[in-house]
Curated annotation (Swiss-Prot):
Gene3D superfamilies: Vaccinia Virus protein VP39. Belongs to the class I-like SAM-binding methyltransferase superfamily. Erg6/SMT family. It comes from the Eukaryota. One of its GO terms (cellular component) is endoplasmic reticulum. This is Sterol 24-C-methyltransferase. The keyword Lipid biosynthesis applies. InterPro entries: Erg6_SMT_methyltransf, Methyltransf_11, MeTrfase_SMT, SAM-dependent_MTases_sf, Sterol_MeTrfase_C. It is an enzyme of class 2 (transferase). Its EC number is 2.1.1.41.
Amino acid sequence: MSKQQHPSSKTQITRRRDTADMTFEQVLHKGSSANMGGLSSMLGKDREASKTAVDQYFRHWDGKTAKTETTKVREERKADYATLTRQYYNLVTDFYEYGWGQSFHFCTFAPGETFASAITRYEHTLAHRIGIKKGMKVLDIGCGVGGPARQIAKFTGANITGITINEYQVERARRYAEMEGYGAGEQLKFVQGDFMALPFEKETFDAVYSIEATVHAPKLEDVYKQIFNVLKPGGIFGLYEWVMTDAYDENDPHHKEIRFGIEHGGGIANLQTAQTAIAAIKAAGFELLESEDLADNSDRAPWYWPLGGNAWQYASTFGDILSTFTMTPAGRAIAHTVLGVVESIGLVPPGTKKTADSLSTTAAALVAGGKEGLFTPMFLMVARKPVAKE
């Protein structure tokens, strides 16, 4: 997608008369943004639009492996990052809400914490380290359906704008905000846009944060530069970044297989290393205040335990064992079978099972990457935009 195109204008399907004035997402989701999320939202999608979304996403992955991937294939994926990312979230947002909740990210776990409380505390921690305060104007890069934005707005009293490339997510984020009483006020709002071409004036925001979202950028330096431009001088940018760690060896076939597996079902055009991320944020003009892999700690429970199938060992409550079951290997195997049946009889759109299988492949790669210390979803960076010298 060129920077001049609207994110939802690129995809075209044959228009029926009753959908001529609708965007692709409106045709695809058919008002399901008003549902409660998860499985109920998967029902009733437009079949033709669903096939288009599946085709546009999986054309970058079908028939490709870590062994056969070429530089040309990776560059093509990077060039098509906008469609790749948008269609990925058209396909997986309902799955994420069903299996994970409204905050699409991992977290660290303190002793005795439930899954939900750990997710919230992790969001509050980032807000605290950035120094977000009441009345500040803050940008959430890659806001998803708004879970973190709502929590940070409550925690700090800041005015938060969330941006995501996916229109369906914007609609869901607005609905959840309204359900919590935010309405159309200034404290919490959501817009659709491409973070590689942010639609805001220069020096608009007092602070910016991103939680596991800028990994979708084709080049980290470029998205960090966009953030630098909209941040006020002296403002702080803090993020949790998905990266391959210093232990990753590009020449090791096993390492490359894990990286490719994470990219495949993660909607990621080009997963980078921690050192690349550090260099990128500095090249964008920021003063790096701190960087830390939060996965490299002595937490009782590793960040990947909800995916690993051993919840009985780490979960703090029986409720967490039940709520995370769908994400475990056993839960994913059941989903493979059930979705195959319901898709064959037309209850869910074409490609639903394929999408679930892709997410399962990536879950296995995430666990392997975490256990072997090759990957982290929580590389914390906190950086300041310098104040111009007089």
